[in-house]
Every structure is written in structure tokens, then in C-alpha cells.
Design a protein with these regions (language model features):
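N-terminal secretory targeting modules
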Residues: 1-76, 134-135, 149-188, 204, ...
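Short, solvent-exposed loop/turn segments at secondary-structure junctions
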Residues: 83-85, 113-117, 145-149, 219-224
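Well-ordered, non-membrane alpha-helical segments in soluble/globular domains
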Residues: 121-125, 190-203
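Short, structured active-site "lid" loops
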Residues: 132, 138-143
Length: 240
């Protein structure tokens, strides 16, 4: 399975569309933090050892209920990266799936593996524009990914759409050789701090003005280095 996914955006897009296919993964190495995990558990006794994990996606390429299901059902809405997508997990073991089942809600999980914070902002804009008027979510969760993931877009003229790709600090060759990333994230991290300051405020305010409860979480990999004095909430590290 390909977990660092390119997303596309067209003039008539209702959501970012993920370039992915349904498939089966039996490689435990795809699990986030697998090398650290295997030091702590007995793989011979672990439930997931040698299991084949199916990945099935909806009409927009997301691993969740169909977006059309919100016409008739209440739902929980989740944004995030591979932690929320459930990379290396059965669908029923993903936290958003468990929450939806516990609360008797549909599971609308817009997590994109390998993505940064910017695609969450883009999808929030699109979702708010195209689906909130149908039915508001009961709850919204933002799982903040690694804060040094940078999303950049290129325009495909022949197909008239934007490709949005994410560069990660883990891939140093691509990351520090990009002039924009080097200038605004490494030599001077002003662009990163700009997103730290404004993106959480925006994501929270969208739902707060609609009276929808919103929760901000991270799995110990988002470091908000520049926080607005007007930010009244914390991004909760649920690993601690």
C-alpha cells in the first residue's frame, strides 16, 4: 500500500480527492513507529502478527463511511494523518471508528496518510462549503501531524487540476533541497510559525461559530512553537 499519497483538487472538487486504491497490507513495517513498537512487545503473541489488513475507501478515497451517508445520519468528523487513517490497523480498531460506534454515529474520517496540517485546512474549507449545509457533525476531531511536513501544489495543465504533495523532514534529500522549504522552514522557520499561530485558531473557530464541539489532539509529533494569545484551547498530546 502507498501511504504518502498525492491528493488532487479541481475547480468543482467538494473535497480533496486521494489518489489511492483498495488493497491488502500484510507488512507490519508500515505501522507508524514500528521499530520502537517491536522493542516493547512479543511479536509471537501480538494480535496483528502475520495478519492481512484490508484497506477499503469511499467515493472520495477516504477510509470511512461514504460521504453521502450524512444525508440521513448524524456523524463524527475526523481530520488527521496516518494515525487517524489507521495505517497498520483493522478498520474497526481505528480510534475514529471506535468512537463512532460507541456514539452510534457515522464515521467520516478525512485523514490522509503522510499529510501535514495544510490539507486539513483545505479540507475544512471544502467540507464547510459543501456539506455543512446538509448536516453538521456532532463532533469534530483534529489530529495534528508532524509540524514540519510541508504541502506544496503543482498545476497540471493538461488535466486542469492541482496536485498537492507533502514533503517530510524524514526525507532529507527532497526536503532540504527544495529552495522554498530551505528558506522558510529551515534557514528561517517563519512559515512554520505562521501556521502554528493561525491554523489552529482557524480550525477551532470554524466549528465554534457553528456550536459544534471540536477536539484538538496530537500523537506527540506536533510542536506548536508560536501560539496566539487568543487561543483558548490546548492541543492535547494523548500519548502522555
Amino acid at each position: 500500500m502507498k501511504f504518502n499519497m498525492v491528493t488532487t483538487l479541481k475547480e468543482d472538487s467538494k473535497l480533496l480527492r486521494i489518489d489511492t486504491e483498495d488493497g491488502i497490507d500484510n507488512c507490519m513495517g508500515s505501522i507508524p513507529n514500528y521499530n520502537e513498537l517491536k522493542k516493547q512487545i512479543d511479536l509471537n503473541k501480538w494480535y496483528y502478527t502475520d495478519k492481512k489488513i484490508p484497506y477499503v475507501h469511499n467515493e472520495y478515497g477516504y477510509r470511512c463511511d461514504t460521504i453521502d451517508s450524512i444525508y440521513e445520519n448524524d456523524y463524527i468528523l475526523t481530520f488527521g494523518c496516518s494515525y487517524s487513517y489507521g495505517e497498520g490497523l483493522f478498520y474497526e480498531d481505528v480510534y475514529s471508528t471506535k468512537l463512532a460506534k460507541k456514539l452510534d454515529l457515522k464515521n467520516i474520517n478525512l485523514a490522509i496518510p503522510g499529510s501535514g496540517i495544510s490539507p486539513q485546512v483545505y479540507n475544512t474549507i471544502l467540507f464547510n462549503n459543501n456539506f455543512n449545509k446538509i448536516r453538521l457533525p456532532k463532533y469534530v476531531i483534529y489530529q495534528y501531524p508532524n509540524d514540519y511536513r510541508v504541502s506544496l501544489s503543482t498545476y497540471e495543465e493538461t488535466r486542469n487540476h492541482l496536485d498537492i504533495d507533502t514533503f517530510t523532514a524524514g526525507d532529507i534529500k527532497e526536503y532540504d533541497q527544495n529552495g522554498y522549504i530551505f528558506d522558510y522552514y529551515l534557514e528561517n522557520d517563519g512559515e512554520k510559525k505562521l501556521k502554528d499561530l493561525l491554523f489552529p485558531l482557524y480550525l477551532n473557530n470554524v466549528w465554534e461559530t457553528l456550536n459544534v464541539p471540536v477536539f484538538h489532539i496530537t500523537f506527540s509529533d506536533y510542536n506548536q512553537e508560536f501560539k496566539s494569545k487568543y487561543q483558548s484551547f490546548e492541543i492535547l498530546d494523548i500519548v502522555d
